[in-house]
Amino acid sequence: MRVTVDSEQCVGAGQCVLNAPEVFDQDDDGVVVLLRADPTSGTTRRSARRATCARRPRSSSRRTEPAGCADRHRCPVRPGPRTRGPADPPPANTDRRQNHRRDSPVTTADDTAARWLRRYHPAEADAVRLVCFPHAGGSASFYHPVSARFAPGAEVVSLQYPGRQDRRKEPCVPDLGTLADLITEQLLPLDERPTVFFGHSMGAALAFETAWRLEQKGAGPRTVIASGRRGPSTTRAERVHTRDDDGIVAEMKRLNGTAAGVLGDEEILRMALPALRGDYRAIETYTCPPDRRLACGLTVLTGEDDPLTTVEEAERWRDHTTGPFRLRVFTGGHFFLTQHLDAVNTEIAQALHPDRAAPAA
C-alpha cells in the first residue's frame, strides 16, 4: 500500500528545513521515502518508509485522531488509490477524507487555514494563544517543542509558509509585505483571545508586520516577541538571495545553525534551497517606514555575537512601539535561542501570563 506523509505533522519530523533529522519526499511512483540525515557521518540513507502514525480503525464510526497528530488536522497518513475489483461495492461518499484530497479542485476556507496554521497539541477552551513565525528556510515544526511546552494552557499556532515540507510544491512568497498580508487573512477570522506573537530572524520582522496589520483592524496581539533581528527600519546591504547555491550554503554555515551533515547532503539541499532563496529575498528586500509603530508591548531577544544584528541594532526596535519595551541580551550568535531554551521559554511564559512572576533580568 502506498501512503502519503505530511512531514510537519509527524513527531520527529524536521525542526527546520535544514536542521531536519528526518525529511520525507516521494519518488516518481508516489512511494514515500525517508531521507534521514546522519550529522555524525555526513551521509544520508534513502529508504522506503511506512507511516508511523496509527490509522483510524475501520470499525469505528467516530472520527479519532492518531497519537501525535495535530488537533483539527487530518491524519497525516492516507492510503493511496486502489483498483476496485468486480466484487467491490460502489464507492460511498461517506469518508470525509474523500472530500479533502490534495488534488481536489474545491478548496474550502478550512482547507486554506489548515495549510497555514498548524496546531500540534490540543488546548483548553479558554487558553491564551501563541502564534509562532519561523525564520528564513524554517517550517512550522521548528516550534513543535514550544507547543509541547505550553499546551494545553496555551493554543500554540505555528505558521507554515509556502514552499517547504508538505507545501514545497507551492511557490514561495518572495515579498515580506505580501506574506504578511496572506498571514493576516488567516489570523483575522480566529476567535478573539489574548495573543502573543513570537518570531525569530525573518519571523520577527514578519510577526511585526502582521501585528501592525491586525492592529489596523482592531485585532492586534497583546505582545510581540522579536528574536534575532534588528529594528524593522534598520537596513543592511545584504544580497544572499542573489548568490548561487554554494553561496547560500556558505551563509548557512556562517550562521552555525545547521548540522554539517545536512549541509553536505545534495538531496536534502535540493529540496530546501528554493525555500531558503525565496525567504532570503523576502527579508533582504524588506523595508519598513521609520514611523511604523505598534501599540502593543514589544520584547526583543538578541545574541551578543549575532553577525546579523548588533545589540545597538536590536535596541532600535524601541522606536517601533508606543507600548512597553524590553530588550534582553544573551550569550551566543544568531541561533542563541537553541542554547538558552529555558530562558526563552520563560520570556514566552511571562508574555502569555503577565500576572505571574516576572522572568529574571
Swiss-Prot record:
One of its GO terms (biological process) is lipid biosynthetic process. Residues 2-29 form the 4Fe-4S ferredoxin-type domain. It is an enzyme of class 3 (hydrolase). Keywords: Antibiotic biosynthesis, Hydrolase. Residues 62-74, 94-104 have a biased composition (Basic and acidic residues). Residues 36-110 are annotated as: Disordered. Its EC number is 3.1.2.-. The active site is at residue 201. Residues 46-61 have a biased composition (Basic residues). SMART domains: PKS_TE. Pathway: Antibiotic biosynthesis; candicidin biosynthesis. GO terms for molecular function: hydrolase activity. It comes from the Bacteria. InterPro entries: 4Fe4S_Fe-S-bd, AB_hydrolase_fold, PKS_thioesterase, TEII, Thioesterase. Probable thioesterase involved in the biosynthesis of candicidin. Could release the macrolide ring from the polyketide synthase. Belongs to the thioesterase family. This is Probable cadicidin biosynthesis thioesterase. It comes from Streptomyces griseus.
